Amino acid sequence: MATFEQGDVVRVPFPYTDRRTRQHRPALVISNGGIGEYAQFLWVVMITSAENRRWPDDHDIGSNYREVGLPAPSIIRPTKIATIESRDASPLGRIPRSLLRRVLETISRHLAL
């Protein structure tokens, strides 16, 4: 089983809140690696196409989207957090440390940390 770190971009079956289906899509690992007994879970936030309507706390991945393993310009959506099983994740790439820092600051602000 692959191990993951905070800042990794992965492909996961991301759950939808409005229906019972799942779609494989990219996500950003925000947990400090695997969590839970035997590190079997990851906390991730959604990555979506830059063509979608922007939400206030979205972060643009920018022109280096291919370097992080994404097929198209994309944004990170910290508002959409999920817990997934690490065995369901496939590695795609990593985001730059500066972008990860901004995403984590957004999440910390919402958690009042």
Predicted regions span which residues?
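C-terminal terminal-subdomain/extension
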Residues: 2, 65-113
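Short, charge-rich amphipathic segments
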Residues: 4, 30-46, 93-98, 108-112
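Short, charged beta-turn/beta-strand-edge "cap" motif at the junction between a beta-strand
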Residues: 15-19
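Compact nucleic-acid interaction/catalytic patches
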Residues: 20-24, 29-64
